[in-house]
Amino acid sequence: MEKKIYKHEYFGELYYLVNVPEEYKNKKGAPMLVFLHGSGERGKDFNLIAKHGIPKYINEGMKIPAITVCPQCPENFIWNNYVFLLKDFIEYAAKEYGADTEKISLTGISMGGFGTWEMAM
């Protein structure tokens, strides 16, 4: 997974990992999967993002037929506090990587599950 930093005008930097499968590079209309990690992976450390869940599986060789983006929640915060940042980030990632905005899925574990629920509300 590639290491990237998204810069937001109000929230500052958001570290994230991205995986674009070969079949979706330089093409538009791909599905996109957004993975939110748990509370133990907050901060500004790419290795923490890849510790559990989908980024770990991709690094171990799992093929996911979608663009996968995995943002990192800033330290001392929870995803529930960052719904507006997540919304902006997802819009940015969809445009940046050519995802179909009708084919975006959001998932998470632990604190990331709560963030997923909050985004759905």
Please state what every model-predicted region is:
Residues 1, 49-54, 88, 111:
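Short amphipathic alpha-helical surface micro-motifs
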